[in-house]
């Protein structure tokens, strides 16, 4: 398993020379497993460039949005795979917070 933090900037994207070390994108994390499954946690601004890569590779993706704050969703409309039905599969939508605790990722 490999976990990569792509967006750690906070509520407002702020790319530029002063943010090069840690990046300027808002929240999103990529989890890659050995069986080629991928999970994206949240949908911050850096998601756009990752989406371009996944479109080229024709890679399937699972996305979990932790909550609806702007810094966690603002990259979502620009994530190209959501506009390609063959790469998108919406399985669950949880409205009950206690139910989310029961969700087991990558269970077969």
Predicted regions and their residues:
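Binuclear metal-dependent hydrolase catalytic cores
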Residues: 1-108
